[in-house]
Amino acid sequence: MSRPRIGFLLPHYPRRSTSHMPLVMRALADAGAIVDLVHPTGRTVDLSQVRVEHDLYVLRKMSGLALSLAGALHELGAAIINSYPATATLRDKIVSFRILQAAGVPTPATFAASHPDELLPQLADGPLVVKPYQGGGGHGIRVVRTAAELAAVPYDRHKPLFAQRYHAPDGRDRKIYVIGGRVFGVKKVFPRRTDADKHGEPFTPAPELREIAVRCGCAFDVDLYGVDIVESGGQPYVVDVGSIPGFKGVADAVQLLARHLYAAAERAARGEGALSEVLS
């Protein structure tokens, strides 16, 4: 069988980045795959020359040119992990949380608004967590308890506001990572300031948390993802689902990801679809 070709659409990583992805690319090449960096390349893209040239594309970047290129490749029939539609959906918390609710995933009460003032009545029932409706990584998250704090929330009239009921955590947040149906748990603090905070403490997820994580993956038909869970009063609440996160704290993450992507590329080359059988 010919060597699988895998193209990566990635963020711009700084030289001292601790991301696993450059190491995953190296591991795939060592395993015999032909690995190319499709984005970033530092040059203009001639859209007429965009065509499917790889058995599999790995979409790690959730915005900008990389996401748009993934959309173009998707329309041309490319196999992408995670798929362009799923990645675009997960980028929008308003859309993704309605999907999670419909799938029976436990989430905090969730609200969308056009202006901070519209959220004021919700404070009567307790604090809110206000966060950007797009993006991730814990950026721009605020716990709002008063009208004054709500008025201080940065506001762009061209973008909606996204808010959830705040539930005080029983302890550290539970980060559940899934690699092709394999479930890994890491306890993490928020906000994460040090490398130790980012790697957290591995733990074995209880069956309830495993089931929640798998249900999240099935809701979006994704193979590589992370689920943020806050446990409050013994009740788990999903507060975020991310496409292809950093997998920090997962033992042997580089090799696990490389093996999964290599197998997915082989399946895609045979026309069988890139997703693992666990979620197909």
Task: Describe the residue ranges of each PLM region.
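Conserved N-proximal alpha/beta basic substrate-recognition cap immediately N-terminal to
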Residues: 5-109
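Short beta->alpha connector loops
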Residues: 40-43, 61-65, 113-117, 167-169, ...
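A short beta-strand motif that forms the metal-chelation/ATP-contact edge
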Residues: 54-58, 176-178, 235-247
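Rossmann-like NAD(P)H-binding beta-loop-alpha module
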Residues: 108-128
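Phosphate-binding site of ATP-dependent enzymes
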Residues: 139-220
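A long amphipathic alpha-helix within ATP-dependent nucleotide-binding catalytic cores
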Residues: 193-238, 242, 250-279
